[in-house]
Regions:
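Glycine-rich, proline-tolerant flexible connector loops at the mouths of alpha/beta enzymes
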Residues: 38-55
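Alpha/beta enzyme core
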Residues: 28-34, 137-140
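N-terminal amphipathic alpha-helix/helix-capping segment at the start of soluble metabolic enzymes
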Residues: 1-20, 241-245
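Hydrophobic residues within beta-strands of alpha/beta enzymes
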Residues: 39, 93, 145, 196-197, ...
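C-terminal helical cap(s) of enzyme catalytic domains, especially alpha/beta-barrels
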Residues: 53-63, 106, 189, 204, ...
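Short hydrophobic "strand-cap" motifs at the C-terminus of beta-strands
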Residues: 19, 177, 204
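Conserved anion-binding
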Residues: 43-47, 60-177, 181-185, 208
Length: 246
């Protein structure tokens, strides 16, 4: 392949998908069947979606190869994080509290275990005051920065922040979260993917049975995954058209 040919080929778009806050075997199976890439287990005891380490390990054993278990922690002790991750084969960590870069680094066993760091972005116009570039630089050891809306508690609030206020160029892999549904994820992917290295999406409340936190709806899971794939197809079409433009 010549350099000229390489320049005109469109980049392939495939958005990775994580479903978070699972508590039941049937929901894990439904997510895997739908084709998700990662499953999140909440180990924060104050969350209505909380599961024990033992339960997370039990559910994670249902996962096939190449579907990653993600353990969500909020201001947990380093020793307990390391022990929990060691109990769930193939797990990576997600830090969703007030953990400093140094604390994340230590809890990841100095980079031996990949981790995500959540950024809690204020809702509405207040989001413009959040310095994502500095946050991404401070947590540059993280595999990705997860973008969530700042709400009471830590995550799973079902609210979306203003995506248009994000910086135009973030030197990091991003995970878009917060208030996503099958109805808005295409818009979210379209707005955010051009701003970062790669984009993944993370959903919890948007695929739940109404009023039942931690209980997922298989139809909503499948609808969400289908919407993400439509977004990928749309971006691929746009990239192809751009390459054909003189």
């Amino acid at each position: 392949m010549t350099q000229t040919t390489a320049r005109v080929l469109p980049s392939l778009h495939r958005t990775r998908i994580k479903i978070c806050g699972l508590t039941r075997e049937s929901d894990v199976d439904a997510a895997v069947t739908a084709g998700v890439d990662a499953i999140g287990f909440v180990l924060y005891e104050k969350s209505p979606r909380h599961v024990s380490v033992q339960r997370a390990a039990e559910l994670a054993r249902r996962l096939p190869p190449f579907v990653t278990p993600v353990l969500l922690f909020v201001n947990q002790e380093t020793s307990k994080i390391i022990a929990a991750c060691a109990s769930v084969a193939g797990a990576i960590a997600q830090f969703h509290g007030d953990e400093s870069p140094a604390e994340c680094w230590l809890a990841s066993e100095q980079g031996k275990r990949p981790y995500l760091r959540a950024a809690r972005i204020p809702l509405g116009d207040a989001g413009v005051g959040f310095d994502l570039l500095k946050f991404a630089q401070d947590y540059s050891q993280a595999q990705a920065i997860l973008l969530d809306a700042q709400v009471d508690g830590y995550g799973g609030g079902g609210h979306a922040f203003n995506w248009s206020l994000l910086p135009p160029n973030v030197n990091a892999h991003l995970v878009l979260s917060g208030g996503l549904t099958a109805a808005n994820v295409i818009d979210g992917i379209t707005q955010v993917r051009p701003r970062c290295k790669t984009l993944s999406v993370d959903i919890s409340s948007g695929v739940e049975v109404p009023g039942q936190k931690g209980i997922k709806d298989p139809e909503k899971i499948h609808a969400f995954v289908a919407a993400v794939r439509r977004a990928d197809q749309q971006l691929e079409t746009l990239a192809t058209q751009a390459c054909k433009t003189p």
